[in-house]
Amino acid sequence: MKQYLELVAHVIKHGTLQANRTGVNTISFPGAMLRYDLQEGFPAITTRRMAFKSAIGEMVGFLRGVSNAAEFRELGCKVWDQNANENAQWLNNPFRKGEDDLGEIYGVQWRKWPAYKRIDTGNVAAIELALGQGYRQIAESEEDGQSFVVLYKAIDQIRQCIDTIINDPGSRRILFHGWNCAQLDEMALPPCHLLYQLHPNPQTREISLTLYIRSNDLGLGTPFNLTEGAALLSLIGRLTGYTPRWFTYFIGDAHVYENHLDMLNEQMTREPYPMPKLVISDRVPEFAKTGVYQPEWLELIEPSDFSLEGYQHHPAMTAPMAV
């Protein structure tokens, strides 16, 4: 994981001190990239103990469309507690439904993106096409003398992605994201890791992932997001018959919080250990072995289905999360 430490050092050396919404200053640098070959190992940080089970619990929660901190806790992940219940801006938001509510965050958008179509009532062909695509009419109205209908359906972006990997692996449109502009004000926290693009290669039977993160806390967020992205790529590869390969990780605003400097400076004095290996439980079907496509495992997967083999690490360290 030398790449990670080199990025931290670069941001600390070349970044600029900036104020932000959290009240804790950051040293920030625009534009950064990491790239890992998952055939060489799993990108878990080794210069301190990684909260692997917590990160995997969060990923499983996203796959289930979880929107409540209590449900994340049941999956072994407590990182959403503060954003749900201590974020003053969210606490005063009329869209918040009560204790532990997080609103329309990541997994809701991934699995149940709210899609609407407004179609003139005279365009019968377009209405019939939309109905055939699973939309249903929810309203009829008129504006400026023109009558129209409104249709709605929830889109499962991840299911669409893995269906496309199976049916059209040459597509360059296999992606999902959580940046729903219409619902940003309905979220405890707008998505940071916001766009995932999958790249299956039918010739090599390898699959790669490009992830774009608009804003990344290098001390706490990056290790979590690397773990989740690599595990998600490995799971999707297993369910579709591809070997996980390249994980490319782009960051828009790469930053270090001032109160994380002691932890990160200490980590940079530690020698990284070799990368561990991700192991997925035998109970999770492998398309490459069975030839049977079982997308329902996106919901059936459990945090306990993932483990690290050969994970050596330096002692654990902690730092506060900015909310």
UniProtKB/Swiss-Prot annotation:
Pathway it works in: Pyrimidine metabolism; dTTP biosynthesis
EC number: 2.1.1.45
GO cellular component terms attached to this protein's record: cytosol
Protein name according to UniProt: Thymidylate synthase
Subunit structure: Homodimer.
GO terms under biological process: dTMP biosynthetic process; dTTP biosynthetic process; methylation
Family named by the database record: Belongs to the thymidylate synthase family. Bacterial-type ThyA subfamily.
UniProt: (6R)-5,10-methylene-5,6,7,8-tetrahydrofolate binding residues: 217, 322
InterPro entries in the record: Thymidate_synth/dCMP_Mease, Thymidate_synth/dCMP_Mease_dom, Thymidate_synth/dCMP_Mease_sf, Thymidylate_synthase
Predominant localisation class: cytoplasm
GO molecular function, one term: thymidylate synthase activity
Keyword Protein biosynthesis: no
Keyword field: Cytoplasm, Methyltransferase, Nucleotide biosynthesis, Transferase
Binding site for dUMP: 21, 172-173, 214-217, 225, 255-257
The reaction(s) this protein catalyses: dUMP + (6R)-5,10-methylene-5,6,7,8-tetrahydrofolate = 7,8-dihydrofolate + dTMP
Subcellular localization, as worded in the UniProt entry: Cytoplasm
